[in-house]
């Protein structure tokens, strides 16, 4: 974990924070919903420990060369440390969910930096075209792993609902599909427990979603008032209803499980041993020294 610590210590200049929303206006495009076959959808089953040990090597190819990622991460580290010092709820949320600090910072970086989450999801949607594409052209392996693990840890925390009823608004794109169809978002999809929040992001398509694999991330979001629920790219949904309202589409989706083309793609194809117990805290200990959180 040494390189991870060094990268975080280095720091980067601050830049302005922009609200996370899509650009409004322009012609509406139609895009058909599908199973997002090119999405990188790894769930890292049975390789959590190996993947965590690979993070220092991955940092050399992601944190250092790609300044936007490093800058967003550095700002998230600073903001999380400041939040934890003034807001006991942040500390309680971290301990209550057993969320590793690295995962908390990944969630914060994802929600606070407009350029990062857009560029990241653009890459996630295409990095699954081949394993070679993932290995050599996908420069967000660390962020993908940490977000995936964060959602899993949050969902396993005591008191988290099994399924959540959420909304997602999209501007400028009218999605099409048919009732009964199985689909995936194919990216980390931001949704909200509040319908009015989704409408702020757009109304060209409004998704009303019952998710059973998304997690409530409000305690780790830069915008907690949005009551965000983040859905992983591998969750599948059944289209239950589609309604057209003028130029806008209203689509109901119900969780139908998960589907992944990849598992532990960073490692050669072979049987992987189960992760040993006691991994939780390895990244936490390293990052706590940097952020000054308890």
Write out the residue ranges for each language-model feature.
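N-terminal signal peptide
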Residues: 7-48, 287-294
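Internal glycine-rich, Lys/Arg-flanked active-site/core loops of soluble domains
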Residues: 49, 55-211, 215
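C-terminal GPI-anchoring signal of eukaryotic secretory precursors
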Residues: 264-281
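Sec-dependent signal peptide recognition
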Residues: 1-7, 280-281
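Short peripheral tails and domain-boundary helices/loops at the edges of structured domains
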Residues: 128-130, 261-267
């Amino acid at each position: 974990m040494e390189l991870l610590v060094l990268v975080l210590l280095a720091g980067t200049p601050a830049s302005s924070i922009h609200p996370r929303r899509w650009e409004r206006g322009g012609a509406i495009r139609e895009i058909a919903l599908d199973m997002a076959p090119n999405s990188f959808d790894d769930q890292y089953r049975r390789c959590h420990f190996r993947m965590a040990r690979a993070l220092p090597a991955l940092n050399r190819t992601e944190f250092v060369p790609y300044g936007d990622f490093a800058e967003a991460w550095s700002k998230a580290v600073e903001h999380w440390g400041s939040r934890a010092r003034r807001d006991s709820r942040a500390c309680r949320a971290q301990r209550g969910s057993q969320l590793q600090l690295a995962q908390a910072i990944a969630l914060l970086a994802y929600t606070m930096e407009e350029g990062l989450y857009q560029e990241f999801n653009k890459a996630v949607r295409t990095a699954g075209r081949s394993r070679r594409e993932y290995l050599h052209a996908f420069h967000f392996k660390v962020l993908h792993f940490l977000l995936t693990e964060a959602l899993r840890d949050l969902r396993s925390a005591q008191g988290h609902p099994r399924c959540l009823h959420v909304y997602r608004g999209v501007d400028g794109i009218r999605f099409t599909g048919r009732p009964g169809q199985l689909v995936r978002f194919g990216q980390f999809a931001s949704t909200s427990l509040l319908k009015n929040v989704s409408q702020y992001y757009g109304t060209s398509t409004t998704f009303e979603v019952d998710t059973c694999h998304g997690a409530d991330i409000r305690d780790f979001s830069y915008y907690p008032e949005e009551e965000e629920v983040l859905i992983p790219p591998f969750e599948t949904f059944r289209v239950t209803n589609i309604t057209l309202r003028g130029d806008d589409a209203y689509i109901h989706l119900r969780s139908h499980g998960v589907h992944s083309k990849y598992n532990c793609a960073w490692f050669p194809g072979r049987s992987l041993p189960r992760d040993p117990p006691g991994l939780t805290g390895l990244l936490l200990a390293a990052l706590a020294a940097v952020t000054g959180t308890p």
